[in-house]
């Protein structure tokens, strides 16, 4: 897709009345905005500046090469630019199957070949144009008007001789026979017109000709009824300029299913076509219409490509590559299409093209990542500046206060938050941006990983190492998965030393990433490095525990605003994930020790687990050690619980607790709990909430919790994890405070 599509080298600020300029700027930022393109085209057509119109249409058609051709050609026809028109027809007709475009083409041919002045030669050219058009789009259910145009043209011919009259009759009958077997929208009306015409030509032979086509007509009429039922009379043939992800009204999904029903109907061959190639032609035609109507749905392009490959992979290979390249112009961030095209290039042994396809996707994703990162930095920098201004204002006010107010100021200091406050709107936006950033990070990591694997397959380990180096240089935030996959690739290429070094390199960046530690532990177990396993376990466990402790301490700050509570909720989820990683790490090491270690060490691990997670059921760790690959006998037979050992463990699952206290949900992130909140829950939640005390946390307790010191004040580092017993002891030893 071309960059700098509209921006000039000496670009000036747009005037507020410069609608065209503003639209061009918007399209420079988002070249795939179909609606803005249409507005721009309307604006330039109204201005009627030829060079500007041509420039906009050419840029538009480089992206949407299936749309707006009729509009552009009509503009040139109105100006009498017939040479331009012919060039446009030569560009669009080979790549676009559109009924109205073909009708416009025939209309142009008739305009430039007058049968009155041109005679038989002109008539022959027009007939050829009609034949081209009906061959190209005559099977379309909406092609009835084109066929009728053809018939009307033939019927308007006034023969000069008897043999010409017979030739005219034969031509008309031949067109009718082709027309009547195609299930067009007004097929019954066409049949009625045909039977009337046959009787007018020759009543004695009419029944014979009508009987020959009645069976095929009945099939076509029946198909027409089935088609309307399958598409529920709501199929949209015009462009729907949205994709799956912004399909708020479920329009794309609904239309997609209707197109699939049409394709399924064609596969059933209810028209009883004897030639398989005719069935394939109809299916192909429907796919072409579908991708024109839903151009931003990668799934459709993918299935159309697979259809061509199944039909004749060797013959259609080049067509498939062209199709996927067109699809990626409209869906440049599609993983599905990128991976499919790169595989085709790899199979075709054009490796440079395959890597270029990956690089294009990485470029788009990296730009998105950087844009989101800039937005996050902009919000945080703005809030930091606001905080500094507030602090400066506060210092000025303090200098004006009397010394007698010092005690009151000391009391207020205890309520100050060491971090800046975010507005509700900014906090929500920041949370969404961070989620999107994390998602893009994983996506970029995955694409680099697949590129590395493709290079390993096609060019060997040396080329894959080049990708490993390139990715770390180009995208510093690349995820741990990339290191793990590269290390395993080296290992399976008989490079154990290199694999170990890559894991060691990964430890420098991801020592607090539980998923990386688990993968590294699996690797060490696989290569049977006993001492290294123990060292990694202790290092990883220590790093994760420290990280969790820091998060717990940070969470004890002032969270009086709903905005900060949103951020706190996000951090809490992340903290739960880290705790789950700690559990997995201990369980994995415990299972390893149960096979290759000794019982004393296993018991020591049990004690440490219970110390770190005192609220967890002690049976959980014990039963995990004795579960099989496909069955957990303790959980299933002794505890009577559902056996989930064969299922993948959800790393985001909540912690398993001996008892769970369900606090009522607070909709507006305030400390007060309203009885009205239960109205917004489902029946199950309502029953659960009714069982809990109302107003569980009031303002008094909430304000007390705000000013409590963090966990680091309650003892040595080993006690930094929250201990509810010590909190109860603290409350019990508080002196009685007289109330007024």
Swiss-Prot record:
Gene3D superfamilies: 1.25.40.1040. The keyword Nucleus applies. Its main location: nucleus. Keywords: Cytoplasm, mRNA processing, Nucleus, Repeat. Residues 392-413 have a biased composition (Acidic residues). It is found in: Nucleus; Cytoplasm. InterPro entries: HAT (IPR003107), Rna14-like (IPR045243), Suf (IPR008847), TPR-like_helical_dom_sf (IPR011990). Residues 672-688 have a biased composition (Polar residues). One of its GO terms (molecular function) is mRNA binding. GO terms for biological process: mRNA 3'-end processing. Residues 381-418, 668-688 are annotated as: Disordered. It holds the Pfam family Suf. HAT repeats lie at residues 48-78, 80-114, 121-156, 167-200, 236-268, 278-310, 494-526. It comes from the Eukaryota. GO terms for cellular component: cytoplasm; nucleus. Component of the cleavage factor IA (CFIA) complex, which is involved in the endonucleolytic cleavage during polyadenylation-dependent pre-mRNA 3'-end formation. This is mRNA 3'-end-processing protein RNA14.
């Amino acid at each position: 897709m071309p960059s700098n599509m509209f921006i000039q080298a000496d670009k000036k600020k747009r005037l507020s009345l410069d609608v065209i300029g503003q639209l061009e700027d918007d399209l420079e930022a988002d070249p795939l905005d179909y609606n803005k393109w249409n507005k721009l085209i309307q604006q330039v057509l109204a201005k009627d500046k030829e060079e500007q119109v041509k420039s906009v249409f050419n840029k538009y058609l480089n992206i949407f090469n299936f749309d707006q051709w009729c509009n552009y050609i009509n503009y040139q026809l109105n100006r009498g630019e017939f040479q331009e028109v012919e060039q446009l027809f030569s560009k669009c007709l080979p790549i676009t199957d559109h009924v109205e475009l073909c009708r416009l083409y025939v209309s142009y041919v008739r305009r430039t070949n007058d049968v009155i002045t041109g005679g038989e030669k002109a008539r022959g050219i027009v007939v050829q144009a009609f034949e081209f058009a009906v061959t190209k789009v005559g099977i379309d259910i909406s092609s009835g008007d084109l066929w009728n145009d053809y018939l009307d043209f033939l019927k308007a011919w006034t023969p000069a001789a008897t043999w010409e009259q017979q030739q005219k009759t034969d031509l008309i009958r031949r067109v009718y026979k082709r027309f009547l077997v195609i299930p067009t929208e007004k097929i019954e009306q066409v049949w009625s017109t045909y039977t009337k015409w046959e009787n007018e030509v020759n009543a004695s032979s009419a029944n014979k000709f009508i009987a020959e086509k009645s069976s095929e007509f009945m099939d076509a009429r029946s198909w027409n009824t089935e088609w309307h039922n399958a598409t529920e009379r709501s199929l949209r043939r015009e462009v729907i300029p949205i994709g799956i992800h912004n399909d708020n009204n479920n329009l794309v999904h609904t239309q997609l299913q209707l197109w699939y029903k049409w394709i399924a109907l064609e596969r059933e061959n209810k028209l009883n076509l004897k030639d398989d190639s005719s069935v394939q032609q109809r299916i192909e035609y429907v796919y072409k219409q579908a991708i024109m109507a839903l151009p931003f749905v990668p799934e459709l392009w993918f299935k159309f490509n697979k259809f061509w490959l199944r039909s004749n992979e060797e013959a259609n290979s080049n067509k498939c590559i062209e199709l996927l390249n067109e699809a990626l112009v409209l869906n440049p961030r599609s993983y599905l299409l990128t991976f499919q095209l790169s595989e085709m290039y790899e199979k075709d042994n054009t490796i440079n093209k395959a890597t270029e396809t990956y690089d294009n996707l990485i470029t788009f994703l990296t730009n998105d990542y950087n844009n989101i990162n800039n937005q996050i930095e902009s919000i945080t920098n703005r809030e930091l500046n606001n905080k500094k201004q507030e602090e400066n204002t506060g210092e000025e006010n303090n200098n004006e206060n009397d010394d007698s107010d010092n005690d009151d100021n000391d009391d207020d200091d205890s309520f100050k938050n060491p971090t800046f406050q975010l507005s509700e709107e900014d906090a929500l936006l920041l949370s969404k941006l961070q989620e999107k950033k994390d998602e893009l990070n994983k996506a970029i990591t995955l694409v680099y990983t697949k590129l590395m694997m493709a290079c390993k397959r096609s060019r060997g380990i040396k080329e894959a190492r080049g990708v490993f180096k390139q990715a770390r240089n180009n995208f510093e935030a690349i995820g741990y998965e990339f290191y793990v996959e590269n290390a395993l690739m080296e290992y399976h290429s008989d490079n154990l030393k290199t694999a170990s070094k890559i894991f060691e390199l990964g430890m420098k960046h991801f020592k607090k990433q539980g998923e990386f530690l688990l993968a590294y532990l699996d690797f060490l177990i696989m290569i049977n490095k006993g001492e290294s396993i123990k060292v990694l376990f202790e290092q990883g466990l220590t790093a994760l525990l420290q990280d969790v402790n820091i998060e717990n301490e940070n969470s004890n700050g002032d969270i009086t605003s709903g905005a900060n509570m949103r951020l706190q909720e996000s951090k809490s989820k992340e903290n739960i994930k880290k705790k789950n990683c700690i559990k997995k790490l201990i369980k994995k090491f415990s299972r390893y020790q149960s096979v290759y270690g000794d019982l004393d060490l296993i018991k020591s691990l049990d004690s440490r687990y219970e110390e770190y997670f005192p609220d967890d059921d002690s049976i959980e760790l014990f039963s995990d050690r004795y579960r099989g690959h496909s069955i957990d006998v303790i959980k299933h037979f002794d505890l009577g619980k559902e056996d989930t050992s064969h299922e993948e463990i959800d790393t985001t699952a909540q912690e398993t607790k001996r008892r769970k206290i369900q606090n009522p949900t607070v909709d507006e992130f305030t400390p007060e709990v309203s009885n009205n909140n239960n109205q917004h829950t489902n029946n199950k939640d309502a029953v659960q909430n009714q069982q809990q005390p109302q107003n569980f946390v009031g303002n008094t307790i909430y304000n007390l919790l705000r000013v409590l010191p963090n966990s680091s004040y309650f003892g040595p580092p080993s006690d930094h994890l929250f201990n509810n017993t010590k909190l109860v002891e603290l409350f019990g030893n508080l002196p009685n405070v007289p109330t007024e």
